[in-house]
Amino acid sequence: MKFIIKLFPEITIKSQSVRLRFIKILTGNIRNVLKHYDETLAVVRHWDNIEVRAKDENQRLAIRDALTRIPGIHHILEVEDVPFTDMHDIFEKALAQYREQLEGKTFCVRVKRRGKHEFSSIEVERYVGGGLNQHIESARVKLTNPDVTVHLEVEDDRLLLIKGRYEGIGGFPIGTQEDVLSLISGGFDSGVSSYMLMRRGCRVHYCFFNLGGAVHEIGVRQVAHYLWNRFGSSHRVRFVAINFEPVVGEILEKVDDGQMGVVLKRMMVRAASKVAERYGVQALVTGEALGQVSSQTLTNLRLIDNVSDTLILRPLISYDKEHIINLARQIGTEDFARTMPEYCGVISKSPTVKAIKAKIEAEEENFDFSILDKVVEEANNVDIREIAQQTQQEVVEVETVSGFGPNDVILDIRSVDEQDDKPLKVEGVDVVSLPFYKLSTKFGDLDQSKTWLLWCERGVMSRLQALYLREQGFANVKVYRP
């Protein structure tokens, strides 16, 4: 079987040296992706296309599907390459190939020709089109918007019968641009922004700020691995996980409620910039869209950018949510994003939309930056190829209850401000306060003869924290959902 790879049009308008470099990189990317399907596969580059030849017919659909997801490819032609003698021979081969497909349909013939011949492309179109129209009674010629377009390519003494055309994702081949680090949360925005930079030719590494224990990290790892495996598996990339719970805890204790969102984003950018510098990455990528949330106003985005010299790319800055969700659906990350948790403990009640630099800096003076340095230093860096095995590990489920027994105590894990604003009172059971960001260090000090029912407003943080505690060996935890 044979496939003809057509280049993304922006590649074809580059200078000769740049075009050749892009084609060489794309050829290497195709080999890296397809070698898993057929090790004997041949990839041959030409000036205006790339040929892929494979012997294992059983892998035809898998190879075709993989090619449609490699950045830099405009479309793929699945072809049958046969010799021919003259124009009538071309017609006979076209009739054998397309007869069933054209029955009862309108059609036209389009021919591309390379080499020296006694006929022109238009003459072949007329001869083959007339012959098909004469020999297939139910078919008729229609030159504009036909049901079927018969594509033929003539090159020297070879005829390419095009059996199918399949659209690629376009863009530039990965590796033609420099590396970037995507701040991935597993939601709609970060997944789509990561894809957009891969499509533009960047090798995308991933940085995840863990606010909810191992379960959340497993979910985000699955998203990152999916994106890499589907669109970027030609290159090795890193997945860096930073335990940001200590940083969030420090912010919740030391920073004014209205400034928390901007300060948290500034801390994330500081941490990600350190990671990017460590690995020689040139830019950060975020999924921020202008005005989508309080921290994404122009004033706040500028303050967030000010904490680092690292370039921050925001490919979704002018997109609305509906457009982003549609893109997530197209690339296959919608289902991941819909089930990814949001954290009730990290949201300000009255976030500022126009933060003042002096006030933000004054709030940050109370912050212990050694905590930030420590979490970056202890960041977990893994090769994304290892994630497939790691994400298969089973996560222990935690029981959810709506009632309580005589040995049960409700543990309110919301932030202190949330608890002060809306105290939890449940008749017939004790309620103890312990903010979620202190659970990892303080839960062991509680009475372990009791069964602790974790509770938060949305029920997501409580479940994840209960799973985290179970992983630490605490079996006396459940989730309370009245």
UniProtKB/Swiss-Prot annotation:
Disulfide bonds join C344-C456. The active site is at C456 (cysteine persulfide intermediate). Residues 61-165 form the THUMP domain. ATP binds at L183, I184, K265, G287, Q296. Pathway: Cofactor biosynthesis; thiamine diphosphate biosynthesis. GO terms for biological process: thiamine biosynthetic process; thiamine diphosphate biosynthetic process; thiazole biosynthetic process; tRNA 4-thiouridine biosynthesis. InterPro entries: Rhodanese-like_dom, Rhodanese-like_dom_sf, Rossmann-like_a/b/a_fold, ThiI_AANH, ThiI_fer, ThiI_N, THII_Thiazole_biosynth_dom, THUMP_dom. The keyword Transferase applies. Its EC number is 2.8.1.4. NCBIfam families: ThiI_C_thiazole, tRNA uracil 4-sulfurtransferase ThiI. This is tRNA sulfurtransferase. It comes from Salmonella paratyphi C (strain RKS4594). The gene is thiI.
